[in-house]
From Swiss-Prot:
It comes from Vibrio atlanticus (strain LGP32) (Vibrio splendidus (strain Mel32)). Transmembrane segments: none annotated. Belongs to the TrpA family. The gene is trpA. This is Tryptophan synthase alpha chain. CDD domains: Tryptophan_synthase_alpha.
Length: 268
């Protein structure tokens, strides 16, 4: 059984959903980034969703763009990221680890080579934000060849045809958009997602994690009540990093204090 499946099985036995924080690897620097990822897991994160720094993140709001800039200023490259992720994998063998990134970085060294490096680092899934299902053929083929789940976004406006493709091509989990637009905690998540979840279930999609604009425990609770398998929080986590760049210890404490109630909110 793969790591996502066994996670969702374990959580179901405890009547819990998943809480999954997102951070950019290498933000604000490699050494602190490793401590950040460890802190998130120790504070209760069920899985990690990670970004690889990129100079032009199209789907991201200003908070995550700032994380990219800090990491790039600290000379973080994909090689540095894979090394850090490998260290997290060694420390937490059961933890599902996903990447959320852009096609340019996948193309940079060849698609197969990229997924092979993911597999070696112990990564479970890859979501490429700017590749829709109808353009995903070569990415899905390479992902499957190396045992990596391709993850797809189910937007609130999706047609049945799109949701069927997301369900058939995707594995691990489905990234459920709570609203259209760029990422960010500034604009609160728009529920209701129940109708979208019902449609996904019709196509037997992988379990849905609700993302975009999730910044408070009550939003996590709402996602679980609506039927999502869990929630992903990115900008709210990265904002804590941004606000504490000069105080590394205070940053880790604030991150732990954010994650613990978010995880507690997944209890049904």
């Amino acid at each position: 059984m793969d790591r996502y499946q066994s996670l969702f099985t374990r959580l179901a036995e405890k009547n819990q959903g998943a809480f999954v924080p997102f951070v950019t690897v290498g933000d604000p620097n490699p050494e602190q980034s490793l401590k950040i990822m460890e802190t998130l897991v120790e504070a209760g994160a069920d899985a990690l969703e990670l970004g690889i720094p990129f100079s032009d993140p199209l789907a991201d709001g200003p908070t995550i763009q700032g994380a990219n800039i800090r990491a790039l200023d600290s000379k973080v490259t994909p090689d540095v990221c894979f090394d850090l992720i490998g260290q997290i994998r060694a420390k937490y063998p059961e933890l599902p680890i996903g990447l959320l990134m852009y096609a340019n970085l996948v193309y940079a060294r060849g698609i197969e080579n990229f997924y092979e490096r993911c597999a070696k680092a112990g990564i479970d899934s890859v979501l490429i934000a700017d590749v829709p299902t109808n353009e995903s053929g070569e990415f899905v083929a390479a992902a499957k060849k190396f045992g990596i789940h391709p993850i797809f976004i189910a937007p609130p406006t999706a047609s049945d045809e799109t949701l069927q493709s997301v369900s058939e091509l995707g594995g691990g989990y489905t990234y459920l958009l709570s609203r259209a637009g760029v990422t960010g905690a500034e604009t609160k998540a728009n529920m209701p997602v129940t109708a979208l979840l019902d449609r996904l279930n019709k196509f037997d999609a992988p379990p849905a994690l609700l993302g975009f604009g999730i910044s408070a425990p009550e939003q996590v609770k709402e996602a679980i009540v609506a039927g999502a398998a869990g929630a992903i929080s990115g900008s709210a986590v990265v904002k804590i990093i941004e606000n504490n760049v000069e105080q590394p210890e205070a940053m880790l404490k604030a991150l732990a204090e954010f994650v613990t109630p978010m995880k507690a909110a997944t209890q049904k």
